[in-house]
């Protein structure tokens, strides 16, 4: 993944590496310019401005780029003179752990935690119901378990609310209302606002902190967090799907969807065995 100030010169250099029929479209709602190569050797990538990327990493406006960066990735090049991008990437990982912990019980395994984290950006994505392998998230974690450990170990050891036992692959979590309130206050502000909109009826206009305090004392606190994330992802995934059809064209979109459905059925049949 590469981020930087998007400029015509950069785009020309990127596009010069691909065939002349490479398409370019703005993926509204995420700030990502989606690029698709042509067969053979189909390649899909995206270009995003630094400011849009920072915004999503810190605020979770779309959970599109930030959600992908909850998983282990290989950063090929990073121009970050002031350290803003590095700090935002770290904040995004910390937010992912915080959100996941709010939805988990008092005791759970490493794999449960990482599966929850990897699944955050798919929560509310309609494509996970129709068109995606049902085992997609589990497969991501299973194939990259050691990378997930490396990515999140420091945050888990630093957390005052978690007892992490790497040798046993188990974690114990303080689920008191006070701890949950502290965790809710640490969530990205856009997610906090979504939670406020869900819990507060129209016209009340209560302070965000007051609403989060109420949620922290609710036995369904984790469910509210999932609903808030789902609201963000649902809007973003619909936008991405529409723009994906425009970018690829209807014929390619149908072929791509057919491949997705095939993978979905394969995953469904595998899970039934």
What is the meaning of each model-derived region?
Residues 23, 32, 55, 59, ...:
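Polybasic/polar functional segments that serve as interface/processing modules
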Residues 29-32, 121:
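Short, flexible loop/turn elements at secondary-structure junctions
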Residues 1-28:
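Helical scaffold of the NTase/Pol beta-like nucleotidyltransferase catalytic core
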């Amino acid at each position: 993944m590469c981020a930087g100030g998007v400029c015509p010169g950069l785009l020309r250099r990127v596009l010069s590496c691909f065939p002349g029929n490479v398409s370019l479209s703005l993926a509204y709602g995420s700030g990502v310019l989606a690029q698709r190569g042509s067969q053979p050797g189909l390649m899909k990538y995206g270009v995003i401005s630094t400011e849009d990327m920072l915004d999503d990493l810190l605020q979770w406006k779309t959970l599109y780029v930030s959600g992908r960066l909850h998983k282990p990735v290989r950063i090929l090049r990073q121009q970050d003179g002031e350290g803003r991008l590095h700090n935002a990437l770290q904040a995004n990982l910390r937010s992912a752990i915080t959100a996941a912990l709010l939805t988990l019980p008092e005791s759970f395994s490493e794999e449960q935690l990482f599966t929850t984290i990897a699944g955050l950006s798919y929560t509310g994505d309609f494509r996970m119901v129709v068109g995606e392998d049902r085992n997609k998230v589990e497969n991501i974690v299973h194939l990259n378990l050691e990378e997930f450990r490396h990515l999140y170990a420091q945050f888990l050891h630093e957390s005052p609310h978690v007892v992490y036992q790497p040798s046993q692959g188990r974690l114990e979590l303080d689920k008191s209302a006070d701890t949950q309130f502290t965790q809710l206050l640490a969530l990205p502000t856009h997610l906090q606002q979504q939670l406020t909109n869900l819990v507060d009826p129209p016209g009340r206009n209560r302070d965000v902190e007051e609403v989060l305090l109420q949620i922290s004392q609710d036995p369904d606190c984790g469910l509210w967090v999932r609903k808030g994330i789902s609201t963000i992802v649902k809007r973003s995934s619909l936008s991405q799907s529409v723009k994906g059809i425009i970018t690829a064209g209807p014929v390619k979109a149908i072929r791509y969807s057919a491949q997705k459905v095939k993978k979905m059925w394969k995953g469904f049949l595998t899970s039934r065995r």
